[in-house]
Design a protein with these regions (language model features):
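Structural motif
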Residues: 1-12
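Flexible loop/turn connectors
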Residues: 11-109
């Protein structure tokens, strides 16, 4: 699905950068660009979202936004447990910082 989305977007207009909203979208974008011989970052800059071990295998190294999934999971579980203890409470907003990991997939075009 991500591959088709990128194909549709890039067939309509030339963009200088793409922010892929999740790991699957990042992969679809990479596959499409490789197939069409679009060079990252020379033709299009790419920022991915979610860091898993495979991102280190790509050349150039991807710039990514890393979410601490373990902290997110912990916050979700704690929120559910709090809700079970006090179902009528409004709940709370929890924020967890993400980290930008600079790679080699972005440049000024």
């Amino acid at each position: 699905y991500a591959y088709q989305q990128v194909q549709e977007i890039l067939s309509k207009k030339k963009y200088t950068g793409i922010f892929a909203s999740n790991y699957i979208s990042t992969l679809g974008t990479i596959f499409y660009m490789n197939e069409k011989d679009i060079k990252v970052p020379d033709d299009v800059s790419l920022i991915g979202f979610d860091d898993i071990m495979l991102t280190g295998l790509f050349k150039p190294k991807l710039t990514i936004v890393n979410q601490p999934l373990n902290l997110i999971a912990e916050a979700v579980v704690n929120s559910l447990l709090d809700r079970m203890k006090a179902p009528k409470d409004k709940g709370k907003i929890t924020t967890i910082d993400a980290q930008l990991i600079i790679g080699e997939s972005v440049k000024t075009i």
